[in-house]
């Protein structure tokens, strides 16, 4: 290891010939380590020669050669020397430590040339486009020249310049000189920027311009690092002014769809400018400027002027474009949301609030819901905010008219589930029921729906008018899923009653087969649990002896199996099939029990007065008039009324129509008494209100029993949380007063707004 130090010293001498890529001083020979046997040894390199000395004037002569080549490049003339020879000359100079001088001389040569280029641009006679072309040519020439010069002086660039961080590369030096002596000249810069802005303005006006010229010049400004300060700020300022004026003008002149198309076109054009010739950094502020001036400043005006019309006309592409554009602007979606909600509430209220439109209300609501759903899906990209606000808006307007929408939705379900409905398939019926359930969710007074739905369901079940048992069960399942088992328990009980009645009738018919005198009447009885079914007003009528006898037989049979129960006959729900003989032949009539009692009288005589029929049947006055109307004034006129007329009056006479003709064998005579009258509607609604009072009373007592003492406001708040139907504060106050009167609770003697539970 004693010879390590001399090896280092000799190696530094070798490195001294490495063309300046490494600094020899950094590798100076280290002193020999102590401990050797005598002095340090030297490593001798055979055939080592000292660096040859340059001839006198070599540096000056070589620079003249290089300077001549530089001038040739700058003047675009041929170079007398080949590039390899010039490159080697630069390498030789750098190897002999004249790099600083060489760099300085090269910079001066380039600077002299660039300074000479400014003179032609100071002529005032050039128009803007010619000026831009001239400055672009100058820039292109300068770039080409600097590339060539750099290739000649590449060794200098990669050694001396690279090792000196304070020096710009030859290329950067060229950019700096061009920026300093040409583009930074106030007149040149002003004409260049103004010319570029003029070309862009012309292009925005629809003229064709030289885009490659713009791309080159803006690239020059970017390369020279003056793009943002000298061009972009002024460009954005002019853009802002242009689109501010354009937005104001076009909002006055154009309809909203046309205006939105123009905005989309402008945004596309500006985006294309960024791609084609503007610097990428300009994209964000440029697009933001267009959006602000053409959209942001006019959001409310656009919506007020055009949204309602687009929605009324179902202009789906235009609405999609509006959503897409408004989503680009801060506050745009929120503004669209608010107007969207107002439109839904206004349009929906017009459907719900007008009694003249009650006939078509539910179908109109379903169609409107389909329409807004389609708009949300296709135009608003299923945006959850639009979906949720649509639901809130539907809930708001549909409850502006209490009770009626709930009633009509129940009737609409009835029309779909009744036999003879026009739904083509089970799948279509199922889809319709799903849509109806969506409307049902929006209703606050679901108890009103339940009351009318139950009444109509009873008719369908008792008269056998259901289109499909599966559809009925499906609807029941939907209601149960939506409102819970408590809501549908009575409805499910109605179905159970019908199934149990079928079993009972099977056993009853078997029982009757064993009887010696079963009679001519085939009786079918439905046993209904009173708590499940709607409340029916009982009517005592005079049945025929055969009917009374059969009733007693069934009563004995049923109570024999179910002792302790009580049967109450509901004559208003009875119906029958009657056989009749006419001159033209035999017919069968599907009629109500009241119609049956009237027609059976004509087995005893050919004609009776209104008063005689009333006395014989015991049917209540108004019900009898409707019954006789159906038999004598309808399409199937089994009776002839005298005098003729549509209304049944006191003293009218009725005779049997022996000449009756009809193309069908079995004829169904409209059961007018089963059609809902105004009185029935009022009665159903009143029962709902009565039930609500009971529920309010029960809730108040339940709360007070638990809390013992409670303030008025807290009690009302608790009630709102517990009750599942809308209720007014005044109604709650009345129920509280009623309970105080009935000693369920009492007021505090010192604080009238405080209540105490009375055990």
Curated annotation (Swiss-Prot):
SUPFAM superfamilies, per database record: Cullin homology domain (SSF75632), Cullin repeat-like (SSF74788), Winged helix' DNA-binding domain (SSF46785)
Superkingdom classification of source: Eukaryota
Record key words, sorted: Biological rhythms, DNA damage, DNA repair, Host-virus interaction, Isopeptide bond, Phosphoprotein, Ubl conjugation, Ubl conjugation pathway
Every Cullin neddylation domain range: 691-751
Gene Ontology molecular function: any one: ubiquitin protein ligase binding
Biological processes, Gene Ontology terms: cell population proliferation; cellular response to UV; DNA damage response; DNA repair; G1/S transition of mitotic cell cycle; hemopoiesis; in utero embryonic development; intrinsic apoptotic signaling pathway
Linked residues for Glycyl lysine isopeptide (Lys-Gly) (interchain with G-Cter in ubiquitin): 33
Position(s), cross-link Glycyl lysine isopeptide (Lys-Gly) (interchain with G-Cter in SUMO2): 8
Entry's Gene Ontology cellular component terms: Cul4-RING E3 ubiquitin ligase complex; Cul4A-RING E3 ubiquitin ligase complex; cytoplasm; nucleoplasm; nucleus
In-chain residues carrying the UniProt-annotated modification Phosphoserine: 10
Covalent crosslink: Glycyl lysine isopeptide (Lys-Gly) (interchain with G-Cter in NEDD8): 705
Family: Belongs to the cullin family.
The protein's assembly and partners: Can self-associate. Component of multiple DCX (DDB1-CUL4-X-box) E3 ubiquitin-protein ligase complexes that seem to consist of DDB1, CUL4A or CUL4B, RBX1 and a variable substrate recognition component which seems to belong to a protein family described as DCAF (Ddb1- and Cul4-associated factor) or CDW (CUL4-DDB1-associated WD40-repeat) proteins. (Microbial infection) Interacts with Epstein-Barr virus BPLF1.
Protein purpose: Core component of multiple cullin-RING-based E3 ubiquitin-protein ligase complexes which mediate the ubiquitination of target proteins. As a scaffold protein may contribute to catalysis through positioning of the substrate and the ubiquitin-conjugating enzyme. The E3 ubiquitin-protein ligase activity of the complex is dependent on the neddylation of the cullin subunit and is inhibited by the association of the deneddylated cullin subunit with TIP120A/CAND1. The functional specificity of the E3 ubiquitin-protein ligase complex depends on the variable substrate recognition component.
Name this protein carries in UniProt: Cullin-4A
Gene that specifies this protein: CUL4A
């Amino acid at each position: 290891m004693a010879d390590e130090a001399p090896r280092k010293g000799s190696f530094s001498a070798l490195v001294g010939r490495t063309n300046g890529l490494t600094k020899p001083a950094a590798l100076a020979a280290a002193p020999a380590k102590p401990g050797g046997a005598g002095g340090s040894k030297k490593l001798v390199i055979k055939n080592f020669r000292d660096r040859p000395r340059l001839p006198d004037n070599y540096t000056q002569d070589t620079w003249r050669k290089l300077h001549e080549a530089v001038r040739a490049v700058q003047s675009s003339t041929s170079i007398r020397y080949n590039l390899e020879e010039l490159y080697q000359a630069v390498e030789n100079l750098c190897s002999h430590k004249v790099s600083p001088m060489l760099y300085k001389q090269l910079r001066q040569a380039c600077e002299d040339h660039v300074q000479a280029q400014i003179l032609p641009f100071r002529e005032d006679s050039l128009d803007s486009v010619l000026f831009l072309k001239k400055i672009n040519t100058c820039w292109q020439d300068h770039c080409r020249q600097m590339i060539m010069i750099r290739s000649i002086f590449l060794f200098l660039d990669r050694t001396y310049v690279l090792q000196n961080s304070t020096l710009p590369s030859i290329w950067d030096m060229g950019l700096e000189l061009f920026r300093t002596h040409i583009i930074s000249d106030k007149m040149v810069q002003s004409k260049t920027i103004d010319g570029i802005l003029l070309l862009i303005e012309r292009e925005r006006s629809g003229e064709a311009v030289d885009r490659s010229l713009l791309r080159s010049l803006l690239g020059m400004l970017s390369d020279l690092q003056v793009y943002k300060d000298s061009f972009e700020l002024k460009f954005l300022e002019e853009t802002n002014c242009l689109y501010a004026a354009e937005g104001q003008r076009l909002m006055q002149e154009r309809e909203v769809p046309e205006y939105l198309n123009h905005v989309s076109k402008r945004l596309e054009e500006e985006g294309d400018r960024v791609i084609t010739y503007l610097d990428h950094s300009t994209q964000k502020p440029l697009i933001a400027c267009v959006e602000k001036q053409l959209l942001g400043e006019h959001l409310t005006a656009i919506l007020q002027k055009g949204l309602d019309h687009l929605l009324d006309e179902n202009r789906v592409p235009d609405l999609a474009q509006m959503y897409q554009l408004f989503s680009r602007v801060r506050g745009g979606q929120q503004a669209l949301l608010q107007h969207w909600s107002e439109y839904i509430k206004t349009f929906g209220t017009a459907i719900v609030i007008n009694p003249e439109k009650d006939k078509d209300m539910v179908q109109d609501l379903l169609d409107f819901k389909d329409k807004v759903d389609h708009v949300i899906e296709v135009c608003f990209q299923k945006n959850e905010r639009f979906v949720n606000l649509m639901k809130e808006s539907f809930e708001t307007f549909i409850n502006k008219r209490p009770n009626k929408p709930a009633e009509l939705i129940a009737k609409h379900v009835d029309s779909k589930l009744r036999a003879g409905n026009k739904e083509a398939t089970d799948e279509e019926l199922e889809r319709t029921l799903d849509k109806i359930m969506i409307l049902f969710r929006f209703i606050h007074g679901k108890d009103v729906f339940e009351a009318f739905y139950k009444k109509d369901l009873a008719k369908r079940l008792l008269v056998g008018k259901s289109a499909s048992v599966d559809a009925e069960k499906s609807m029941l399942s939907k209601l149960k899923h939506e409102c819970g088992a408590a809501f549908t328990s009575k409805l499910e009980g109605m179905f159970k009653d019908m199934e149990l009645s079928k079993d009972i009738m099977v056993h009853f018919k078997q029982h009757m087969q064993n009887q010696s005198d079963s009679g001519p009447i085939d009786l079918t009885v439905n046993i209904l649990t009173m708590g499940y079914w709607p409340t029916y007003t009982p009517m005592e009528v005079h049945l025929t002896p055969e009917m009374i006898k059969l009733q007693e037989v069934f009563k004995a049979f049923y109570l024999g199996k179910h002792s302790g129960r009580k049967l109450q006959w509901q004559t208003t729900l009875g119906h029958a099939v009657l056989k009749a003989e006419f001159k033209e032949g035999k017919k069968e009539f599907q009629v109500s029990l009241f119609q049956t009692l009237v027609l059976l009288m004509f087995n005893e005589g050919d004609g009776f007065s209104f008063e005689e029929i009333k006395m014989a049947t015991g049917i209540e006055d108004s019900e009898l008039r409707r019954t006789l109307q159906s038999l004598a004034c309808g399409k199937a006129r089994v009776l002839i009324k005298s005098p003729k007329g549509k209304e049944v009056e006191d003293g009218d006479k009725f005779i049997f129509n022996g000449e009756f003709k009809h193309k069908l064998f079995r004829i169904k005579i409209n059961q007018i008494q089963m059609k809902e009258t105004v009185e029935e509607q009022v009665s159903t609604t009143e029962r709902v209100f009565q039930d609500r009072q009971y529920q309010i009373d029960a809730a108040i007592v339940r709360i007070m029993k638990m809390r013992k003492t409670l303030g008025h406001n807290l009690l009302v708040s608790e009630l709102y949380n517990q009750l599942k139907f809308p209720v007014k504060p005044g109604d709650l106050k009345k129920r509280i007063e009623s309970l105080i009167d009935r000693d369920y609770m009492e007021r505090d003697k010192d604080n009238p707004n405080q209540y105490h539970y009375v055990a």
